């Protein structure tokens, strides 16, 4: 609810939302919002060998909403576009970019759990207000980005972090800029497998992507139970928590967008049935946590993460050494 309201307030006009076998009431909430004309909701069931996220991305590329769009943002519901430009609208951001921009690499900003143990029915952006600093190059997750792309750019498929590009020999390279509107180097534009901004410009003075991948310890247990939509082989475990639980600095920059978000959120809650469905979903999460935390494996994980302190930002020198050792360790 908050995620939709936030991006509606920022100027997103159309939402194409894929849900994946939800049992927490999310599907019913999305159906109610779709019936009211707020979003398009497409429940999906996994078919074939692709991950369910890639299945959705390939389907979305063929959807009429994608075909009529001017700009496109692929985003998970734990990612909030944080626009720093005065006005805090996507239209304000676009005006601040070079005219020939095809894509914006929006750097992730990892937000920690802010020492919040139990889930609350309160805005994510108001609860979790501590993050990694802008300069944070380790672990690799701190250097990832999401892409705001011009629909008419030289692309032929959506991607989790960046779109697939048409052959450069036929369409040329897309004009990429960072979150400050500065042109990205050609090596970045040419290598569409590059998903990290490590050692590359990662400006964020115009916009960035707040990533609330942990939230409370309670919510994290439910995330562990569900798994990731694109990498079922990746464990949601203590390592995942430590690599993302940065509470290094107070970061409330997104609060400038909250008044407009709250207006939209109130409007969404006035849609018949939505508030009741939301309340049921909140109760489901609390009940699910209680069922999980009394199981040995989940209890062990919960106990460890509440004992674990915030993650430390490594020095540039140590980060570089770790990268060199990584190259040696995984050299084929």
Predicted region positions:
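Active-site beta-to-alpha loop of glycosyltransferases that engages the nucleotide-sugar donor
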Residues: 1-6, 21
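Short, acidic, metal-binding catalytic loop of nucleotide-sugar glycosyltransferases
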Residues: 5-14
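Short acidic/polar active-site loop segments enriched in Thr and Asp
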Residues: 13-14, 70, 102
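Short beta-strand/loop segment that forms part of the nucleotide-sugar
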Residues: 13-21, 42-46
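Short acidic donor-binding/metal-coordinating loop in glycosyltransferase active sites
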Residues: 20, 76-78
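Active-site-proximal specificity loops/subdomain of glycosyltransferases
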Residues: 25-72, 82-85
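Catalytic-site signature of metal-activated, phosphate-bearing donor transferases
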Residues: 83-308, 331
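Charge-dense, extended regions
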Residues: 319-323, 327-331
């Amino acid at each position: 609810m908050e995620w939709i309201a936030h991006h509606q307030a920022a100027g997103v006009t159309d939402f194409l939302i894929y849900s994946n076998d939800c049992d927490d009431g999310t599907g019913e909430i999305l159906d109610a919002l779709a019936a009211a004309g707020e979003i398009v909701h497409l429940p999906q069931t996994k078919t074939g060998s692709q991950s369910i996220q890639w299945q959705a991305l390939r389907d979305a590329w063929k959807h009429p909403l994608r075909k009529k769009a001017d700009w496109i943002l692929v985003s998970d519901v734990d990612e909030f576009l944080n626009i720093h430009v005065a006005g805090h609208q996507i239209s304000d951001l676009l005006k601040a970019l070079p005219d020939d921009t095809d894509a914006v690499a929006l750097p992730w900003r990892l937000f920690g759990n802010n020492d919040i143990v139990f889930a609350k029915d309160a805005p994510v952006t108001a609860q979790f207000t501590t993050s990694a600093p802008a300069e944070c190059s380790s672990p690799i997750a701190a250097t990832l980005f999401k892409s705001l792309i011009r629909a008419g750019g030289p692309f032929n498929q959506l991607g989790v972090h960046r779109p697939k590009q048409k052959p450069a020999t036929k369409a040329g390279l897309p004009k990429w800029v960072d979150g400050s509107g500065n042109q990205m180097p050609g090596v970045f534009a040419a290598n569409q497998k590059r998903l990290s901004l490590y050692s590359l410009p990662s400006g964020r003075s115009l916009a960035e992507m707040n990533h609330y991948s942990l939230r409370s310890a309670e919510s994290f247990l439910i995330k562990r139970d569900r798994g990731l939509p694109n990498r079922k082989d990746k464990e949601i475990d203590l390592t995942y928590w430590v690599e993302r639980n940065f509470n290094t600095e107070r970061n409330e920059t997104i609060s400038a967008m909250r008044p407009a978000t709250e207006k939209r959120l109130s409007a969404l809650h006035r849609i018949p049935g939505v508030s009741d469905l939301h309340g049921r979903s909140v109760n489901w999460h609390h009940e699910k946590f209680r069922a999980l935390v009394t199981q040995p494996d989940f209890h062990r994980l919960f106990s460890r993460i509440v004992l674990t302190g915030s993650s430390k930002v490594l020095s540039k020198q140590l980060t570089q050494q770790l990268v060199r050792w990584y190259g040696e360790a995984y050299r084929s």
